[in-house]
Amino acid sequence: MKIVLLPFLYLILSSTICFELPGDQKFEPPTPHINAPKGAFAKTVLLPGDPKRARYIAEKFLQDAKLVNDIRGVQGYTGYYKGVRVSVMASGMGMPSMGIYSYELFNAYDVDNIIRIGSIGAIREDINLRDIIVALSASTNSNYASNFNINGIISGSASYKLIKKVDEVVEKMGLQNKVKFGQILSSDTFYTDEKENDLKWAKMGVMGVEMEGYSLYLNAARAGKNALVLTTVSDHLIRKEYLTGEERQYSFDEMVIVALETAAELN
């Protein structure tokens, strides 16, 4: 599968130029939200939202997985996938929670790559349940970027290094027809009186709505690190279609394998 990335590459490069001096953020572990010692996390960390999913991934896919964090019930594990050291930890729900955990992993634990793995609601007819969306960029209705005191609007963009690797993995796994590369919306709200407002984003090419990606992308840009958002379509907001809990678990395994294969390729 070959994709054209020039518009998004421009955004990524412009973000890197803006945030090329991350050194003032560095601090030592443990942090207020992670009780793991220095060196406990691998250079690549997978972040599902749900702590139970983090445990499930560690038990099913990692070898010699060790619990390295359990503060607030947010379980983090480090183990090996195909001989490559990989960590998995929950991020919680929403941009504030993702913002905290990704910030501390990048800046206190010297993690280089974070791959978010989670669910998304589709808002376009050409997207189907169980499709995997790779977020080249994340728009938002949040004011998360105001924390960076930028005189303008910054795009939340994936790292080209990770986009390239995941594209190679998708082709190798033969998932070209199921994996979609494009834009997502990171929303501040799950429940809203004006649900049709989310659907308006589809007119701008946005594929689906989730709640974490934008903060991850900005934290990665500010720290000079790499981030990627992988999501499985669990809900279709136009067709009113939804996966059951059992269907989610089975369907999400494919996305998890894509993320782990990408992590292994980064070694």
Locations of regions flagged by a protein language model:
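A C-terminal functional module that forms or caps the active site or interfaces directly
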Residues: 195-234
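Flexible, glycine/charged-enriched surface loops at secondary-structure junctions
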Residues: 63-70, 174-181, 266-267
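Classical Sec-dependent N-terminal signal peptides that target proteins to the secretory pathway
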Residues: 1-20
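Active-site rim beta-loop-alpha module in soluble metabolic enzymes
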Residues: 153-204
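His/Asp/Glu-rich mid-to-C-terminal helical/loop segments that flank catalytic regions of hydrolases
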Residues: 237-267
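Generic structural signal for well-ordered, non-membrane alpha-helical segments
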Residues: 47, 51-54, 94-98, 155, ...
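Generic non-transmembrane alpha-helical segments
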Residues: 165-173, 219, 258-266
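Metabolite-binding pocket within alpha/beta catalytic cores that recognizes anionic/polar moieties
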Residues: 18-165
